[in-house]
Amino acid sequence: MPEELSENLETWYKAVAGVFARTQKKDIGDIAVDVWKKLIVTTPDGVDINPLYTRADESQRKFTEVPGEFPFTRGTTVDGERVGWGVTETFGHDSPKNINAAVLNALNSGTTTLGFEFSEEFTAADLKVALEGVYLNMAPLLIHAGGSTSEVAAALYALAEEAGTPFAALTLGSRPLTAQVDGSHSDTIEEAVQLAVNASKRANVRAILVDGSSFSNQGASDAQEIGLSIAAGVDYVRRLVDAGLSTEAALKQVAFRFAVTDEQFAQISKLRVARRLWARVCEVLGFPELAVAPQHAVTARAMFSQRDPWVNMLRSTVAAFAAGVGGATDVEVRTFDDAIPDGVPGVSRNFAHRIARNTNLLLLEESHLGHVVDPAGGSYFVESFTDDLAEKAWAVFSGIEAEGGYSAACASGTVTAMLDQTWEQTRADVASRKKKLTGINEFPNLAESPLPADRRVEPAGVRRWAADFEALRNRSDAFLEKNGARPQITMIPLGPLSKHNIRTGFTSNLLASGGIEAINPGQLVPGTDAFAEAAQAAGIVVVCGTDQEYAETGEGAVEKLREAGVERILLAGAPKSFEGSAHAPDGYLNMTIDAAATLADLLDALGA
């Protein structure tokens, strides 16, 4: 390690150690913590994120990859060719004429890639009207046709022949292997194989979409989404080769789609790793140059909330940034109210789509990210994290292959069990507020208008992070509708505002995340009329103050509250202040509790 770097690291270490020392009121030499280890954060995949990355990391790794070259970790374009990513928007669930009008407006407003979602309302027979005025050789198409992909493909082929032009790029989106994971509609594997055989005879057409978002919808970690997607891709290639296609032709039929969340650096690395691992597969199969399969990115449905949906705009901005910087071929930003059936009441669909589209355009046109080749490249952190995540994802892929491949692992229940376990951990992290969701388990807006009951329905096939807390809010809304007020709990602030404010703020925020209104009567002193009045009016209270205040007046406050007939006494803080006390609270509210379970119990007690 260079001497200058070593000295800088030592200076940094002393500065950080000084913070710990001041917190513990000790000298630096006396603190009983390993500062470096204390600051390491471990991801759900088991990747340790160090507090600092420097040139020292380069000596342990090989940061030699360049953009546009195998294994394409740093993207598929070389210096000077970067023109950004495609802006994808999906259309459907409307009349063909309305869809056509929306498509033309979107193309004139910055959309470059057109997605189509088919249903009973919008079928293959409607494509001619929907695509009127669209140049198929200029606008890439991404199809979501469920079980009718064959009909849609035939209709598109006919339109292209009628126009006498090849497709700019057409992904038919057949996804039977991944669709079985989240229950989404798709063709059979036999139909998918035949689609690919037919598509292989046409230019710029790929039949197969390995849809990693299906794994994300069911709670997959980043490594799992990548590893399972690569395994599914290999399964498709094997089936296509068995059907008579050459390995080269089979590889040309595969495209990928990944879900991106607002965990910025993890998502940048996820897309980089996915390309690297697929490149390795292509290399083993003898065609390393075919590793440049399209990589579609879409904002993850799991991260979208129904409550305070405006925050979803911010989540989507970070996710789209990560996808673009990570090297996605194109990026689709879902509308901010995607989790709400029919959207936010009173908000037009045009507005929601415009904001989603403009999120991409802001990143491309105002921030100029599209003019930079691999913006994250060369970052010691991103390169190191990419390497570590690649190891974890390859381990997932290898484990699936060891079971006989993707289909065998699905049939045995291995894939489901893997996703269930990861989801339960995510759910627990949200419940304990270790995983923070703004507007949901942190900083909720209890004053927002309740959603109508028919718009609180959970999206099918998606395990949303916010669902458990939003179920509590739904209970609160029902209570409000019936009683004219929300369920309430009274706080008992001890000491002056400057002392109790931190914990009254914490308590208000926590209770609001469960739909409970916290009543703050201001500073109360045990033994006074104001204290007695507040206690007598409350069935459940939360005592709020400093640890010092608890030591001085906490036991007396609890005793007076019991004498006043309070049914349940909670305290904001840790149990240590009441160890061995004859008058201890019934429970504690702090950062270590299962907040979702605690709030559900409180709603039960309040009759909500």
Where are these regions (language model features)?
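Hydrophobic alpha-helix feature that most strongly marks membrane-spanning transmembrane helices
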Residues: 273, 279, 283-286, 318-325, ...
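Catalytic alpha/beta active-site cores
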Residues: 1-263, 293-294, 330-334, 487, ...
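Short beta-alpha connecting loops at secondary-structure transitions
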Residues: 141, 179-184, 217-219, 299-309, ...
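Conserved, mostly hydrophobic/aromatic
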Residues: 46, 110, 164, 278, ...
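Accessory "access/gating" subregions that flank catalytic or transport cores
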Residues: 234, 241-244, 252-260, 272-290, ...
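Intrinsic disorder at enzyme termini
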Residues: 1-18, 23-24, 35, 39-41, ...
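Short glycine/threonine-rich loop-to-helix capping motif typified by GTGT followed
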Residues: 221-226, 261-273, 300-314, 343-353, ...
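Flexible glycine/proline-rich, aromatic-decorated loop/lid segments
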Residues: 288-298, 307-341, 348-369
